[in-house]
Amino acid sequence: MKTSVLLVILGIAAITVQCTASESVKQDSLRTFVDAVLGWNAEMASEARCGGWMAKCADSDDCCETFHCTRFNVCGK
């Protein structure tokens, strides 16, 4: 009787570990997708701030480089 109870408990623990591991993989792929979308939005916002190749961005410390604003770059260098 004690052996069967122990086996049931070990089985439940194994299933729980497997489900938890499977869930974290799903969450990681969802997180990757969300990060990709948010990164794309940030890239689009950066392009919108640029006036053109190596132009000055709206922020005085920013400079356009390949139509993306980059922090602490000096235009023309």
Swiss-Prot record:
* Annotated tissue distribution: Expressed by the venom gland.
| Cell compartment(s), UniProt | Secreted
Q: Can you tell which superkingdom this protein's organism belongs to?
A: Eukaryota
Quote a single Gene Ontology cellular component term.
extracellular region
User: What disulfide bonds does the UniProt entry report for this chain?
Assistant: C50-C64, C57-C69, C63-C75
* Gene Ontology MF annotations: ion channel regulator activity; toxin activity
The record's keywords, sorted A to Z, are: Amidation, Disulfide bond, Ion channel impairing toxin, Knottin, Secreted, Signal, Toxin
Residues excised as propeptide: 22-49
Where are the Lysine amide residues found in this chain? K77
Span of the secretion signal? 1-21
Family membership: Belongs to the neurotoxin 10 (Hwtx-1) family. 65 (Jztx-21) subfamily.
Query: Which comment does the entry carry about domains?
Result: The presence of a 'disulfide through disulfide knot' structurally defines this protein as a knottin.
Q: What does this protein do?
A: Probable ion channel inhibitor.
Q: What is this protein called?
A: U14-theraphotoxin-Cg1a 2
